[in-house]
């Protein structure tokens, strides 16, 4: 293989040591909190039939521009999952799960985007879906779960909750008419993407980051002016619930989310510390998605958080266990080291022994200079059933009887 192929594919990233530990910490914390809220962990394949994701909406950027699609050897249209929700809905329907049910998942997702800071083509998400409740209390619970995660990560004071309410279908239909009427007056001044969306999905223009679009949107009609009584009551209950939990929020009527299936409550937790990639957690209601994919009519709400973005914001130092290095001297000692290493590891002690041939004691000690404890034994120690235990931080060294070795090491590593 050519050398220039021995590298990461553009938009992907290797994870090593401390960075991987940080990722695992975030994912483990999320699953722990999910369990407190009654979520069941599930896992779906990273590949699905393409039609699973076309329900995201033919006007969404994910479907039209960003999906990794291919035909397998059987001629089936396959897609690397670009998000979790549709795959989880597929699981819900195909496994005929009983609702209400709360499902937690995590792992890599794939989108063909322009790579930049905290925006890769393969990235990782933690994902929460709640199926079976149309109550605004469910929305409050899910948002509080987000806030719980951010608080545990010590980010709650650096993140802002932005929330919007898209209303029911009656509200959306009425608002679309007036929004299109307003935007048509500025059609030629809109960005190219927004000119296309004006025809196929005008609500998505509200989410535009284009400077020319933002200027036009300043005087656009607000969806809140078109709420019917049901929408007003629902949104008020959500906001009252957040107030009751002392969760601060900002109402932002331009939040519509990038996927076509969202309705009613939509929200984002944003930060000013990641440049243009300011959304850390995002989600909302999708009461019509399950039915549109062939299931029963099922109200639902969910959200996903970007692990890379959370990782970029938090300080985390993996507490590494104290390392014990074996330095056997001579063939008999090496034979004993095999047994000793196995027995210590079975007792939960971290043993590092990589040089099975051995060199000089001086050389081995030099290589072990950054470790915690060294065990030295040769013919003399084997005959007396002892091991030299050296603390590499203090330089202290003592002979320890083999029968006392485990207790001695456990005392040192606590």
From Swiss-Prot:
Keywords: Aminoacyl-tRNA synthetase, ATP-binding, Cytoplasm, Ligase, Nucleotide-binding, Protein biosynthesis. Its main location: cytoplasm. It is found in: Cytoplasm. Its EC number is 6.1.1.21. The keyword Hydrolase does not apply. GO terms for biological process: histidyl-tRNA aminoacylation. GO terms for molecular function: ATP binding; histidine-tRNA ligase activity. Homodimer. One of its GO terms (cellular component) is cytoplasm. Belongs to the class-II aminoacyl-tRNA synthetase family. InterPro entries: aa-tRNA-synth_II, aa-tRNA-synth_II/BPL/LPL, Anticodon-bd, Anticodon-bd_dom_sf, His-tRNA-ligase, HisRS-like_core, HisRS/HisZ. NCBIfam families: hisS (TIGR00442). This is Histidine--tRNA ligase. It catalyses: tRNA(His) + L-histidine + ATP = L-histidyl-tRNA(His) + AMP + diphosphate + H(+). The lineage of its organism: Bacteria, Pseudomonadati, Pseudomonadota, Alphaproteobacteria, Rickettsiales.
